[in-house]
Amino acid sequence: MARAIPDAGFEAVPFGCDPWLLVASGEALLLPHVATIFALGNGFVGLRGPGDGAGKPHVYLNGVFEKVPIAYHEAAFGYAQESDLRLSVADATRPNISIDGVAMGGPVRIELDMRRGVLTESFVVKGIAVQIERLVSMSRSGVIASKISIDCSDAQRVLIEPKVLPPPSPKATFDPSITYDPRVAPPLNESQWIEGQAIETELHCGRVDRLPASGFSVAAVSSTATLITDGDADKLDFAIFAAYAATRDGDPLGDALTALSDAWAAGFASLAVEQSDWFERHWAKSQVKIPDLPAAEQAVRYAQFQLVQAVCRDGKASIAAKGQTGEGYEGHVFWDADLYVLPVFAFTRPEIARAMLVWRIAGLDAARSNARMMGQSQGALYPWRTIDGAECSSFFPGGSAQYHINADIAFALRTYVEATGDRSILDEGGAMMLVETARIWLEIGYHDPAHGDMFVINRVTGPDEYSALVDNNLYTNMMAAAHLDYAAEIGLAAQLIDNDEAVRMRLAATKIYLPFDEAHGIYAQDDGFFNRQ
């Protein structure tokens, strides 16, 4: 029986066909996903676009999370015990703006300029035009800069007052009528944040909040110069800066205040030039042109734009499944980061691909622990979903059983090395990661006499996570063979394995079993694929 897929309710949004711009106005601004589509980020800070409304989660920090226990009605051996959970942090990006006592509402037009990395929002308050240009600096890790321009010719009083809002309250109700994915985590009933210190001086305001289980402290600060004008200017331009910093082993406030001070001293115009220059260099290496198809070119460019905004570039985190746009999938990193995202950067921005591999290598000890938890006596098993390195999946059959994640990471490593010629990553932990992850295949697979002594891998889940715990998933077996072959080559060269282990790896790769269905003349997804109704 075919599974009905629920209608997500999304409609086409008229964003225009300019290859460099996305524009929304009119009814398009009312659609629920506009705030996601117009999100900004720099790999550390993620800022949702306009449309969510006041008090809604708005700002996220890549790699910052809280640890929360996973509750099972009946747990079993190998089940993850806790999850990493991305939470929205304090919001230092949205000042109070009012004209003649009327607070500014939602924008009438928003424009995302992918050439410059700037989002422009246009408002009308009592017939007076207001424009806010905003950027999340690609050159300054935690910095957000905004320029507010107001036509004051008909205004008697303009008030611009920066503020820092506390982290929003968590979602406290679970509506099964609109939740179709069993892997969605249950809601939190109370805030996970512990408020530390609040700061307010003549120059800045802010706060420091702490997540007790993970140990993260997060500082959010904003410039605080409050501007009040009483009809003495025809045009007003005013810049506001915000900065974020996070740490697990110190006080982030000093770092945030330093970043804020440096941004203030540079000024918005200078930061806008920095941003434009950064993207000019990026597009020189990454730009895709599709002649005579501006909408297609726009779509491809937008995908590239969001990738580079979402990926961490310092090796301390990676790229979440939903990027920096929200809390979807709890902010977890999945295997799509290695198989789909990293190759893009390997051929366009190899330093970013390298940083993604550095993060994976740093997780090797956690992957070894995960393998022991899953009952393997040797090797390393990377988690299906994680932020900090431990398995966070509470959906064991479709999650932890996806052993192919090891081969996906090996594919990413090989792609990077062959695309760039940079073999130093192998000496810096890449070769060890490759070998340790390959050893898992020799643990869970075996040469099966029933299949002509071919090497089989049973009771695993492939990319089709709705067909869980199958024998000889085609994708898994093909990827495992390539993984084993490469690990034998690199492991021998690095003297991490002996000849006997290399022979075992190569034999398994050569004799990997691939389920071919003679009746249909095609390879099956797994051994039991054609027996399903």
PLM features per residue range, with description:
Residues 2-40, 45-50, 54-329:
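Acidic/polar, glycine-enriched structural segments that form the non-catalytic walls/loops
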Residues 28-72, 340, 389, 401-402, ...:
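C-terminal capping/lid segments that line or modulate ligand- or cofactor-binding pockets
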Residues 47, 270-418, 533:
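Substrate-binding groove/exosite segments of carbohydrate-active enzymes
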Residues 70, 168-176, 326-331, 362-370, ...:
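Short, mixed-charge aromatic SLiMs
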Residues 131-132, 161-163, 318, 355-359, ...:
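Beta-strand segments within the central parallel beta-sheet cores of soluble alpha/beta enzyme folds
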Residues 302-309, 359-366, 432-444, 482, ...:
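Alpha-helical scaffold segments in carbohydrate-active enzymes
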Residues 325-333, 380-428, 436-507:
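The feature captures the catalytic groove of carbohydrate-active enzymes
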Residues 333-362, 428, 485, 489-533:
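Active-site core of glycosidic bond-cleaving carbohydrate-active enzymes
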